[in-house]
Design a protein with these regions (language model features):
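Generic detector of isolated residues embedded in canonical secondary-structure elements
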Residues: 7, 28, 54, 73, ...
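Aromatic side chains
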Residues: 12-14, 32, 55, 79, ...
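Soluble non-cytosolic domains of exported or imported proteins
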Residues: 38-46, 92, 96, 132-145
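Conserved small/polar residues in nucleotide/adenosyl-binding loops
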Residues: 147-154
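Sec-dependent bacterial lipoprotein signal peptides
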Residues: 1-6
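Short, exposed beta-strand "edge-strand" segments with a Pro/Gly-rich flavor and a Y/T-containing core
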Residues: 15-17, 126, 152
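A structural "domain/chain start" motif
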Residues: 7-49, 53, 60, 65, ...
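Surface-exposed short loop/turn segments
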Residues: 57-59, 69-114, 118, 122-137
Length: 154
């Protein structure tokens, strides 16, 4: 399991409302699936575990397997490569990896806060590196975007 050391400021804010711990006690995070045209078989399970880890470590919510007061689920919908910095010999010296995750957030206590939204992050890396060497950073960025997102603004 990857230890996720986020650099983002966690605000626990979804759709304009902070978590009310007097009403919301539990969260269910369903396994994210990989629906991208290109599939890295380890990415979805790792993303799910990293997301669970953040909630366990940085909220007072109890993680439960089903019927949580809050529920997160979704799928990886994009895992895309693009050549960057093409050299004179027509070989790219850098590659851009973009990961997109669609997330559905449900609040059983306050359904007005429910939303579905896609989050993306990309990183350029030297073409001699493996994509897995930047995946962790991209997943961390997407998790930070999810936390700090105010879906009402989108």
């Amino acid at each position: 399991m990857t230890v996720l050391a986020t650099a983002c400021s966690i605000s626990y804010k979804f759709n304009g409302a902070s978590i009310d711990y007097t009403k919301v006690k539990t969260i269910t995070i369903r396994d994210f699936t990989n629906q991208a045209p290109y599939v890295n078989p380890t990415l979805a399970p790792q993303f799910t575990e990293d997301l669970k880890d953040i909630y366990i470590r940085q909220t007072r919510l109890q993680l439960v397997p089903s019927n949580g007061d809050l529920e997160l689920e979704g799928e990886i919908t994009g895992y895309d490569f693009a050549p960057m910095a093409v050299k004179e010999d027509a070989i790219a010296s850098q590659t851009r990896l973009t990961i997109t995750v669609r997330v559905r957030y449900s609040n059983r206590v306050n359904p007005d806060e429910d939303f579905e939204q896609s989050f993306s992050a990309y990183r350029e890396f030297d073409s001699n590196l493996m994509p897995q060497q930047v995946e962790g950073t991209l997943c961390e960025e997407i998790i930070c975007l999810l936390y700090t997102s105010d879906a009402a603004d989108d």
